[in-house]
Regions:
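Short hydrophobic/aromatic-rich beta-strand segments that constitute the beta-sheet cores
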Residues: 23, 66-68, 97-99
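Surface-exposed loop/turn positions
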Residues: 43-45, 79, 87, 95
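Conserved short histidine dyad/triad with adjacent acidic residue
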Residues: 35-51
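A short, N-terminal "cap"/entry segment at the start of jelly-roll beta-barrel domains
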Residues: 1-34
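Ligand-binding loop in jelly-roll beta-barrel domains
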Residues: 85-110
Length: 113
């Protein structure tokens, strides 16, 4: 097995998620410590949190807000957000983001109040 992985995100399927739709690279590999997602946030996302995962968001397109533990923070392209485990969060508005979960995304670590 090579010492690298390659993903063509434009060839990955869109998957429904609490934020809209996502394409997830490296989420199904046991060899990754992180995954990379391109997320199209269609509407206001559903508030959720993670007990284990840290997430790093990078806004690519759109102007909106992130709700972080109840506080609304304005975001625009090239805004980066570091979301630690336990932080209740959601995007507000139509955005396109890159999401890097660490460790790699696990749908069992997605919690809703």
């Amino acid at each position: 097995m090579p010492n690298y992985l390659i993903a063509h995100l434009d060839e990955l399927p869109h998957v429904k998620c609490p934020c809209g739709f996502t394409r997830r690279a490296f989420a199904d590999s046991k060899h990754t410590v992180a995954s990379l997602h391109v997320v199209d946030i269609q509407e206001d996302a559903r508030t959720h949190y993670h007990k284990q995962m840290t997430e790093i968001y990078l806004v690519l397109e759109g102007d909106g807000q992130m709700e972080l533990d109840g506080k609304l923070v304005p975001v625009k392209p090239m805004t980066a957000i570091y979301i630690m485990p336990g932080c209740r969060h959601r995007a507000v508005g139509k955005l396109k983001i890159i999401n890097i979960p660490v460790p790699a995304f696990d749908e069992q670590d997605e919690w809703f109040d």
